[in-house]
Amino acid sequence: MIVGHGIDIEELASIESAVTRHEGFAKRVLTAQEMERFTSLKGRRQIEYLAGRWSAKEAFSKAMGTGISKLGFQDLEVLNNERGAPYFSQAPFSGKIWLSISHTDQFVTASVILEENHES
């Protein structure tokens, strides 16, 4: 049973601006493992990665119905599986979490669906 659905969209330019204006912005949003991946990337790909994680975490908080103010960015971690698909490796939810992140030249969007585990 689906218990929550959250969607977020961000302009890449606004994330890039936040990185430029606020030293430590990436460290506030990303966990240590996410930060490792972030620092291995260069240029525009770095901004896309950070924006994708930001958007995924915002979408998760909306699916939970709490907003990001009730969750910390460090409470949520998005990694990639062996095929490159993003998944929540850390999140305060015991059921199934469905995550999709997409980019264009200007925007990033994320969708999160929370599904309760039901055993028959």
Swiss-Prot record:
Catalysed reactions, semicolon-separated: apo-[ACP] + CoA = holo-[ACP] + adenosine 3',5'-bisphosphate + H(+)
GO CC terms, sorted: cytosol
Protein name: Holo-[acyl-carrier-protein] synthase
UniProt subcellular location: Cytoplasm
Family label: Belongs to the P-Pant transferase superfamily. AcpS family.
Name of the gene encoding the protein in the UniProt record: acpS
Leading EC class: transferase
EC number: 2.7.8.7
Gene Ontology terms: biological process: fatty acid biosynthetic process; lysine biosynthetic process via aminoadipic acid
